[in-house]
A protein has these predicted regions:
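C-terminal and inter-domain tail/linker signature
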Residues: 3-166
Length: 166
């Protein structure tokens, strides 16, 4: 085995160890943050106002770019997420960890041009969001999401996202 192939092999193993250590570190930080964080829900019994329900959705949008906010997103325990019809989120814990570990969200640089509509006509309990994602690669995506956030509990029960790149 040549010196070059040994060096490349060692570099490859070192990079795997570094990635593993980075993920382990993120998990440990997440466990600590999860322990100290509570979902951001107004401190009074419902029904909750449109502004409070909008704030629940804004916390989710914040967590797309700020992993530290992941455990403050007020998900219902059985919350599901769909992207363009494909189920990508299965429960609150999985959604919070996805946001915290930030693997699929790490390309998002900024969430902008946010327009929220609470209870669009004929859709009680829905907060509709339209916004643009700017990525680190320079690609923009237009997103339209419907969040089911009933006034009774102010928790996000489901997210239906439609994403168009370009």
């Amino acid at each position: 085995m040549s010196l070059l192939s040994r060096a490349l092999g060692m570099a490859g193993r070192a990079s795997v160890v570094a990635v593993g250590a980075s993920i382990a570190s993120a998990v440990l930080v997440g466990i600590d943050q999860r322990r100290g964080a509570a979902p951001k829900i107004p401190d009074h019994p419902g029904p909750y106002s449109p502004e409070e329900r909008e704030a629940a959705v804004r916390m989710y949008l914040t967590a797309l770019t700020a992993p530290a906010a992941a455990f403050r997103v007020p998900f219902a325990r059985d919350c599901v997420r769909r992207e363009n019809g494909l189920r990508t989120g299965f429960n609150a814990a999985q959604l919070q960890w996805d946001l915290h570990l930030h693997l699929q969200y790490s390309v998002i640089r900024e969430v902008r041009d946010i327009v929220l509509t609470v209870d669009p006509p004929g859709r009680e309990g829905v907060v509709h969001a339209e916004f643009t994602l700017a990525t680190v690669l320079g690609v923009k995506a237009r997103v339209s999401e419907d969040f089911v956030v009933p006034p009774e509990d102010c928790l996000i029960h489901s997210i239906d996202a439609r994403i168009a790149v370009g």
